[in-house]
Amino acid sequence: MNLEEAKLKLSKYGQEQILRYYDELSDDEKNALLEQVDKTDMEVLSAIEHKSELVKKGEITPLDAMELDEIKANYDTFKNTGVEAIKAGKVGAILLAGGMGTRLGSDNPKGMYNVGINKELYIFECLINNLMDVVKETETYIHLFVMTSEKNNDVTVSFFKENNFFGYKSEYVHFFKQEMAAATDYDGKIYLEEKGRMATSPNGNGGWYISLKKAGLTQVLENNGIEWLNVFAVDNVLQRIADPVFIGATIEKHCAVGSKVVRKAAPDEKVGVMCLEDGKPSIVEYYELTKEMMDAKNSKGDPAYNFGVILNYLFRVSDLETIVGKNLPLHIVEKKIPYIDADGNLIKPEKPNGYKFESLVLDMIHELDSCLPFEVVREKEFAPIKNATGVDSVETARELLKKNGVAI
């Protein structure tokens, strides 16, 4: 894209401020900015005008989970089916690792955070160790696709190489970058994060399959006959990945997607909850739960909305192609966005000052006809690291790792 073409595009969307410092840039910086303007989807910006209409929930009803007693009763069947699928090369894993460790006080990717006390033990290492348990059990390596972001890709790839992929076979590890979306002020004007660069942020965890596809990695799925993808987040160091019992249960129950869930610690715990929305699987966020929903009971007398999601899903690949063809709902989120002001100074705001645009995994699930909420034991599979201290922190994760026999 040349300068005139960039001016035309920016003029069409009222974003001429992007070129405010163009004349001050080096030739390389100018080319980089023009390329960024070319690649950026600016159609999404119009969504700000319809923000209140964007994501409206339909009728919410409970969705029963497969609970621990049912899993135990069918354990052998589920496990055999899952092991068979893994041995046949039908299972891959997607690690969502685009985030930075900012809230943990680190400038590195979150997965590089050291949770060890007496030795170095990185979040990435914990996850690879968990996946290696299944590799050893099934004597089969599983293709692992690691989604990074523009901001952390190079350092993430280098970190894996420096650590010899934590003992995993490198030919089974594939890196790809998450697509980015522009970040704007409250009037929909895109911020500059540098004089020659628009402010951007990752486009939400619902963009992972489109990003995988754009990176050409769906070819790896086809070439290897991968039919199921276990999608999981970087910040839960205890989660079981490519868990044969979970895979087997989803297959045996003929569900399009499986979702690992934990029993909520309290009715108002800040976790999304599996449900049905207009008869199709969905997730209702904790802040959307009404008192009536929190008090509702199922036929056993247990809370009807009792199982929280832990961002560990199993998707059938054939369904993902269908989902990609549809426009997932757009979520507009208020965030603190560092920006270059009119005087050329970098401002780091103390409170939210604009919007980021995201699509979410929960909207992918809602496009499917069936979902299996699969209960796991919280203390064995849920140790999220969101904060440096307090709830869901490095401290609490360390305690849970120790309880599960992990040397730290």
Specify the residue positions occupied by each region the protein language model found.
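Catalytic core of tubulin tyrosine ligase-like
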Residues: 225-230, 238-242, 247-407
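Conserved beta-loop-beta/alpha segment of the NTase-like Rossmann-fold superfamily
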Residues: 165, 170-269
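A short linear-motif detector with a strong N-terminal bias
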Residues: 72-74, 91-93, 124-125, 153-156, ...
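Residues immediately flanking
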Residues: 97-98, 234, 317-318
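Hydrophobic/aromatic beta-strand patches that form the interior of the parallel beta-sheet core
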Residues: 94, 113, 145, 174-176, ...
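Short acidic, glycine/serine/threonine-rich loops at helix termini
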Residues: 105-108, 155-161, 185-190, 241-245, ...
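N-terminal glycine-rich phosphate-binding loop and ensuing alpha1 helix
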Residues: 3-174, 182, 193-202, 206-209, ...
